[in-house]
């Protein structure tokens, strides 16, 4: 099949007026920055399945998401994960001994705490009899932690699960070069002074050059930012459109923060420093200021910049999920049901960031829903260009037929229902923790706005993606 990034896009809008085709007013207009009105909808069918246990979210919390290199810079990942767990315990008052299992997602592992879920659980005071494990699936690691928990509960293996995720980008592992590592290991095995001196004689100064963490995809040798730039170009997403969307994200996040809607954030007293109470990456600017920034990846003609990309972020999240009957027996009023979910994978070269486009129709079909049934959309915003490219792909019959094997397009999420309290562009994106934030945002929005169904979706490195249906718990 002709590569997606070289073939001309048939029946896809190719001008900056694509928003008119979608019946979307300019993203920067004030009407788009107001919170959406409560969804006036009749109660729809429930998605409960016969002979399968209902899994509910009791509540979820997260530490404030901070720009890397700021207040969390002297911590370790398990410190943040422990803070999220402690915050969850305080929020829910769940007895530690009733938790059957703890699962956390993370991407960049600290060698000292490779099973960060276990170390954080012990640090937060959970019983040493409570098992814990860590999963990694790039930007959908927390999603995998949650759905693993859903499976354990639905199958009857567990009743109470804590799922979450953590990422600390302020202190990523920087290794010695491979030659230096080999030399040091060989020196450790040497049995005589002669052997040691012989090995030392092989040392060269260039052995000291550090090995920085890879930022490119292993399978393609391309950075995600570079891929986002190519994807935006393939779908004719302009720089202005990307900046407008980023401005929308920051403006809505600031509004939600000021109005106290980001209730999943719990204060965290950083040892030796002040208490952190809110996300610090929310920075509404202006299109004029954003236009001054130079391309970050493809220079000089690229359209992806620091302003329309998510930033390196430190943070952790945690959720208490239970079998419905267990939650009710303990006196809890759950926030939402976790319903159908779907994982997808596609070409990591040309479709790296199109996970939401592929996962959305599959999870809707699995749940027996349509786009019109969804009251709250929460999509991970890696880049503005990624979001807008997914919009165009989802609104294209041609793309659906030629790349997805579908007869009709997926359909476009209504912008008035989309990421109404900001997204990863503004709130931040700690790789391993974002999935829980998305689900809690959907659950909290459904309660606030009066909707019934939420759709969470995210892309991930490796050309993978995830989507999940969240159903509001009856009030």
From Swiss-Prot:
Q: Its Gene Ontology biological processes?
A: fatty acid beta-oxidation
Gene3D superfamilies named among the record's database cross-references: 3.40.47.10
User: What Enzyme Commission number(s) appear in the record?
Assistant: 2.3.1.155, 2.3.1.16
Q: Which reactions appear under catalytic activity for this entry?
A: an acyl-CoA + acetyl-CoA = a 3-oxoacyl-CoA + CoA; butanoyl-CoA + acetyl-CoA = 3-oxohexanoyl-CoA + CoA; hexanoyl-CoA + acetyl-CoA = 3-oxooctanoyl-CoA + CoA; octanoyl-CoA + acetyl-CoA = 3-oxodecanoyl-CoA + CoA
* Any one Pfam family match given in the protein's UniProt record, by short name: Thiolase_N
Q: Enzyme group, top EC level?
A: transferase
Q: Which domain of life is it from?
A: Eukaryota
Q: Residues where N6-acetyllysine occurs?
A: 73, 189, 294, 299, 333, 349, 362
Which pathway does it serve? Answer: Lipid metabolism; fatty acid beta-oxidation
Q: What is this protein called?
A: Trifunctional enzyme subunit beta, mitochondrial
Q: What species is given as this protein's source?
A: Macaca fascicularis
Q: What is the lineage of its organism?
A: Eukaryota, Metazoa, Chordata, Craniata, Vertebrata
Q: Which gene encodes it?
A: HADHB
